[in-house]
Structure formats: C-alpha cells, structure tokens
Curated annotation (Swiss-Prot):
Gene: upp
UniProtKB keywords: Allosteric enzyme, Glycosyltransferase, GTP-binding, Magnesium, Nucleotide-binding, Transferase
Note on how the cofactor is bound: Binds 1 Mg(2+) ion per subunit. The magnesium is bound as Mg-PRPP.
Organism: Legionella pneumophila subsp. pneumophila (strain Philadelphia 1 / ATCC 33152 / DSM 7513)
Name used for this protein in its record: Uracil phosphoribosyltransferase
GO molecular function: GTP binding; magnesium ion binding; uracil phosphoribosyltransferase activity
Family: Belongs to the UPRTase family.
HAMAP family listed in its UniProt record: Upp_B
C-alpha cells in the first residue's frame, strides 16, 4: 500500500479523544461532543496548506501587510449521514465555508455504495473541496462521492476521516490516487460485515443513538 497520499494526524489531543470515542460505554452525548472537538482539530491540519495573500491593514499603531486566505471559499462535502457529525466543528473553525451533501448508503449484501441524494453549492469549480466521512471502511462510499465531486472540476479535493482501514485506503487510492487522505488512525482490518476493527462501531448510530454499536 502506498502511504505517500495518507496523512495520519497523530496529535495527542486527537488520540486521547479518539480513545474515549472507541469505548463501547461512551454515551451518545459524549460521543457527539468528542466528534465535534476532534473535527476542529482535524480541520486545523487539513487546511494547513491553504493559499494566502497579503493585504494592507491598519493596526492601532501602524500600517502593515498582513496575510489573509486567498481565492474562493472552501467547500465541505459531507457523506450522509455520519459525515454531518464532522461538519459543526469544522464550520466553527471555517464559518465561511460552503456546504454540500451526498447521500450514500451501503448495500448490506454487496457493500457497494448506493446514492440517494446529491446537493453541492453552485460554482464549486475552482474551489478547494474537503470531503468528510468519519469512517473509510471499504472505501466504496468515499470513492463514489469523490467521483461526483470531480465531475464539477474543483481546484483540489481532500478526503478527511476519523478512522481508515488498510483495505479502504487501497481501494480508494486505486480509484483516486491523486486525492490525499487525512485520518486520525489506520486500524487493523475490516470484518466480514465491512466494519473497521477494532474501530468504534457504526459512527452514525453512535452519533444519533439509533441503535447499539456493533
């Protein structure tokens, strides 16, 4: 597996919070709060290379050239439904970002992604896009979502997740070798049901309290 396009964000705060999220006894409320906090920390890293330019401003004491973000506003694209759990924290850091949603569910028999919703901001072309989903398991949902985004000709695309599997990374970069993956951890493997092991269960279920995590 080629890890040149994979960035593991091994920050102590992220790893500590992720450990609590993994615990089966962590409540829905606590899980949701931690997801918000971790997403802010991940967003800080994934936006590290945004372009800047300089504008002249006046401080109370002097005039100076000071850096500001260059170009059009970012676009965050959430893969529904669990991707929404990452958005609030990211928007707190980048409140001017545009938001898109791609609805995909995984067929339980084939594990393939099935699309049911697609809505992205106008003029996504020439913008930097960050596609978000907490789990990169089989990679099928991420592959399908990024394919849709690419059709709109953005300036750049990155994929951000909490956890990734080796299989998911391999599958994703088999289809999109040009798209970097940012993740908090790479776990051991997938089980027969396509869940990341040891993982944290089903991120959507744990976010919204819809059923017990696997």
């Amino acid at each position: 597996m080629d890890f040149n396009q994979v960035k593991v964000i091994n920050h102590p705060l992220i790893q500590h919070k992720l450990t609590i999220m993994r615990k089966k006894e962590t409540s829905t409320v606590k899980f949701r709060t931690l997801m918000h906090e971790v997403s802010m920390l991940l967003a800080y890293e994934v936006t590290r290379d945004l372009e800047i330019e300089y504008e002249e401003i006046e401080t109370p004491l002097a005039t100076m050239q000071s850096p500001v973000l260059k170009g059009k506003k970012l676009v965050f694209v959430s893969i529904l439904r669990a991707g929404n759990g990452l958005l609030d924290g990211m928007l707190q850091l980048v409140p001017t970002a545009r938001i898109g949603h791609i609805g995909l569910y995984r067929d339980p028999k084939t594990l393939e992604a099935v699309e049911y919703y697609f809505k992205l901001p106008e003029h996504t072309q020439d913008r930097d896009v960050i596609v978000v989903d907490p789990m990169l398991a089989t990679g099928n949902s991420a592959i399908a979502a990024v394919k849709e985004v690419k059709a709109l000709h953005p300036k750049s695309i990155k994929f951000l997740c909490l956890l990734a599997s080796p299989e998911g990374i391999s599958n994703f970069h088999g289809e999109h070798p040009d798209v970097p993956i940012f993740t908090a951890a790479i776990d051991e493997q997938l089980n027969d049901h396509g869940y990341i092991v040891p993982g944290l269960g089903d991120a959507g279920d744990r976010l919204y309290g819809t059923k017990l995590a696997h």
